[in-house]
Amino acid sequence: MSAIAPGMILFAYLCGSISSAILVCRIAGLPDPRESGSGNPGATNVLRIGGKGAAVAVLIFDILKGMLPVWGAYALGITPFWLGLIAIAACLGHIWPVFFGFKGGKGVATAFGAIAPIGWDLTGVIAGTWLLTVLLSGYSSLGAIVSALIAPFYVWWFKPQFTFPVSMLSCLILLRHHDNIQRLWRRQETKIWTKLKKKREKESK
């Protein structure tokens, strides 16, 4: 166990460091997401600059790179504490990718994937919370923030032994959204629908 867990942490970080947003944009001939739109190499920004197909590809890959290392570690019988560190390592890789100059995304989809092995019921509740918040508010960032705040309570209800590692993940997500929190507080955050509408209007001209 002592040798496997650190190895899985390194593996998770390297998986997280594969920035699908940058790779998908390169393959599709789209602008670098770090230099276009919001500047965040994640699925939401790829949706703005490249459309639904590219965004879905990024979303699926980002979820999988969080899910697979944790699922593998879970299957090996690694304890919840180490599972939490493995999940955080995958998110740290996404946020600070060694392969892309340590400039990555905010880790929401990767964190979601890392939580998924705990149970599909929990995964569905968290996904539903994000979707409902976005539909009601129009803010993708607010959906991530609300989901991160509530996720530890959901986990405590479904699988209490994983409350601490999921709480650590939630803190990481909230820290990465500190700029969004300030913009939301000042009412300066742009709704995702507004950005998509502007993109369509620009393309139609």
UniProtKB/Swiss-Prot annotation:
Q: In which pathway does it act?
A: Lipid metabolism; phospholipid metabolism
What top-level branch of life does the organism fall under?
Answer: Bacteria
Q: Which GO terms describe its biological process?
A: phospholipid biosynthetic process
Q: What residues form the membrane-spanning segments?
A: 4-24, 53-73, 81-101, 112-132, 138-158
Coiled-coil segments, which residues? Answer: none
Positions on the Periplasmic side per record topology: 1-3, 74-80, 133-137
Instruction: Please give, as recorded in its UniProt entry, the membrane topology of this protein.
Output: Multi-pass membrane protein
Q: Which GO terms describe its cellular component?
A: plasma membrane
According to its UniProt record, this protein's enzyme class is transferase
**The reaction(s) this protein catalyses:** sn-glycerol 3-phosphate + an acyl-CoA = a 1-acyl-sn-glycero-3-phosphate + CoA; a fatty acyl-[ACP] + sn-glycerol 3-phosphate = a 1-acyl-sn-glycero-3-phosphate + holo-[ACP]
- Alphabetically list the UniProt keywords: Cell inner membrane, Cell membrane, Lipid biosynthesis, Lipid metabolism, Membrane, Phospholipid biosynthesis, Phospholipid metabolism, Transferase, Transmembrane, Transmembrane helix
A single Gene Ontology MF term assigned here is: acyl-phosphate glycerol-3-phosphate acyltransferase activity
Which EC number(s) are documented for this chain?
A: 2.3.1.15, 2.3.1.n5
- Provide the membrane-side ranges marked Cytoplasmic in the record: 25-52, 102-111, 159-205
Cell location: Cell inner membrane
Q: What is the protein's quaternary organization?
A: Probably interacts with PlsX.
Free-text function comment from the UniProt entry: Catalyzes the transfer of an acyl group from acyl-ACP to glycerol-3-phosphate (G3P) to form lysophosphatidic acid (LPA). This enzyme can also utilize acyl-CoA as fatty acyl donor, but not acyl-PO(4).
Q: Which family does it belong to?
A: Belongs to the PlsY family.
Q: Which NCBIfam families match?
A: glycerol-3-phosphate 1-O-acyltransferase PlsY (TIGR00023)
- HAMAP family membership: PlsY
This protein's name: Glycerol-3-phosphate acyltransferase
Q: Which organism is it from?
A: Salmonella arizonae (strain ATCC BAA-731 / CDC346-86 / RSK2980)
